[in-house]
Amino acid sequence: CFVPIPWLINFVRANLGAQDTLLPFFSILTAPDTLMEEGLRFAAIDVGSNAMRLFFCRVLENSHGPTFVKESMIRMPLRLGHDAFTTGTISNDTCDRFVDTMHGFKALVRAYDPITFKACATSAMRQAKNGMELVGRVKNETGIDLNIISGKEEARIIIATHIDRHLKPQQHCLYVDVGGGSTELTLIIAKKALASKSFPIGSVRLLEQQVTKADWAGMEEWIVNKTANIKNIQSIGSGGNINKILTLLLKTKGNSVTISEIESTIKKIEPYS
């Protein structure tokens, strides 16, 4: 579902006075295989509304500070948001599949042996009435401590990827992370996070028709208020939908994408959705 993208394009043009570019941002860098023998290995489990992911990376130290090198990523397309956003409860069958997946992730964590790992759940688990019950089951059956984080904490973690390193000293940007259940916006001025907020707008919610006009209005109002006196803001995006557009455009990670390129891609894929 690419519904958020046209809206973002129109808003950038109408309100931000930005250049005709949206820049997808990726905090994980690539490195030669020879570097894989160095550094410290960490792992993370991300329980999203559209999928679950287990991610391994190594942290290498150099003259510019720590560099995060992607080592491996496993994705399980278990859409918790389908249940959570339509019925308010994660079904028994989905819960069973969820726990089975966590067992598999735990086995891989043991095999990779990182120095530490953390597991977090976001929008779907926040909304599900039985979210905490499922957290307890995961702990009892797998030993994994799964943390359901708030939208505010989710935004904080996203901005902690040190995006400021990739910005010029006086560059202003609106960082947009589009997930399955929520979208996190962070306004960065002169390499400092000035404000951030999470909104209940995401690809799964849109597919399930769970996003209201009030949700869109709330996001627009926040952006207008926070950027009223700021000009030349560049949009920087991340998330599965934005990544997919990058792939369809045959762009390499970190490259700029023009608004016209995104509009052209949307026109091509609309007949198939």
Predicted regions and their residues:
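N-terminal basic/disordered segments at the start of proteins
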Residues: 40-62, 67
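A short acidic Gly-Thr/Ser loop motif
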Residues: 46-51, 176-182, 238-241
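Beta-strand initiation motifs
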Residues: 63-71, 192-194
